[in-house]
């Protein structure tokens, strides 16, 4: 059996890959001056020192950061809306996602809603979504992944659960502008 595999691929995300690449984050051109630093509502990001290391890299890059630590596994629409409100309240002009797929998915949706009015489901295409085009571009996202598997650090999608309708739908929000894939951040992931 012969298989013909043809595809086109476009990934505008700059990728820093390798051991200790997080230590090079400060040398990258940052897309903003104040970041909402999105992490999970768990303990590992802090306990393993990843949050402190990322905050230090942002500080060295001249970027202020505000931590948003409410993202749950399978992020909820209400969490995205709270994150967007926090980004607006603190005058953030970029989002940094530090975590696994759920954090990165939520961060991309937060980036969309931080720069657009209404409800996230206004911009969802599918299910009960209202299929509106966003008026403004999302805030730029920097993704620092601490797990491997979803590819959320290099795709534009964010899967979010609408707790009112029980829908779990991918929202095309934003390609991260920069992804840090540092295998040392994944050493604590269970096998």
Model feature map: region roles:
Residues 18, 101, 145:
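Short, conserved catalytic/metal-binding motifs centered on acidic residues
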Residues 97-103, 149:
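Gly/Ser-rich catalytic serine loop of serine hydrolases
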Residues 1-94:
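ATP/NTP phosphate-donor binding region
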Residues 13, 116-191:
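A glycine/threonine-rich phosphate-anchoring loop and its flanking beta-alpha core
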Residues 68, 103-107, 143, 180:
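Generic enzyme active-site microenvironment
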Residues 60, 72, 112-124:
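Glycine- (often His-adjacent) and acidic-residue-rich active-site loop
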Residues 82-84, 103-116, 154-155:
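Short Gly/Thr/Asp-enriched flexible loops that form oxyanion-binding sites at enzyme active sites
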Residues 46-47, 75, 106, 152, ...:
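Secondary-structure boundary/capping motif
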């Amino acid at each position: 059996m012969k298989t013909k595999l043809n595809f086109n691929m476009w990934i505008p995300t700059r990728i820093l890959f390798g051991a200790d690449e997080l230590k090079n984050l400060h040398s990258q051109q940052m897309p903003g001056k104040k970041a909402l630093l999105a992490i999970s509502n768990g303990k590992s990001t802090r306990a393993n020192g990843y949050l402190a290391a990322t905050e230090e890299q942002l500080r060295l890059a001249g970027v202020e950061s505000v931590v948003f630590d409410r993202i749950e596994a399978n992020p909820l629409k209400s969490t995205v809306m709270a994150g967007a409100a926090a980004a607006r309240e603190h005058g953030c002009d970029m989002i940094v996602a530090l975590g696994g797929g759920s954090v990165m998915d939520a961060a991309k949706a937060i980036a969309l809603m931080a720069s657009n009015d209404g409800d996230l489901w206004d911009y969802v295409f599918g299910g009960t979504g209202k299929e509106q085009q966003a008026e403004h571009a999302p805030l730029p996202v920097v993704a620092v992944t601490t797990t491997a598997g979803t590819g959320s650090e290099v795709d534009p999608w964010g899967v979010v659960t609408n707790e009112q309708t029980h829908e779990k739908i991918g929202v095309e929000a934003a390609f991260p502008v920069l992804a840090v894939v540092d295998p040392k951040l994944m050493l604590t992931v269970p096998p």
